Amino acid sequence: MKVRKSLRSLKNKPGAQVVRRHGKVYVINKKDPRFKARQG
């Protein structure tokens, strides 16, 4: 899990989903899990 300022490039990857949990924005990617990130 990485913490990134901008998730725009990650959400364009194939298989990416943008999820809000507890007021934070996450990108989860089941096809390619190394693209998991939280916006910070």
From Swiss-Prot:
Pfam families per the UniProt record, alphabetical: Ribosomal_L36
One CC-aspect GO term: ribosome
Keywords linked to the UniProt accession: Ribonucleoprotein, Ribosomal protein
InterPro entries documented for this protein: Ribosomal_bL36, Ribosomal_bL36_sp, Ribosomal_L36_bact
Membrane spanning residue stretches: none
Domain of life: Bacteria
Gene Ontology BP annotations: translation
Membrane in keyword set: no
UniProt GO MF annotations: structural constituent of ribosome
NCBIfam families from the UniProt entry: PRK00831.1, rpmJ_bact
Membership in a protein family: Belongs to the bacterial ribosomal protein bL36 family.
Protein name listed in UniProt: Large ribosomal subunit protein bL36
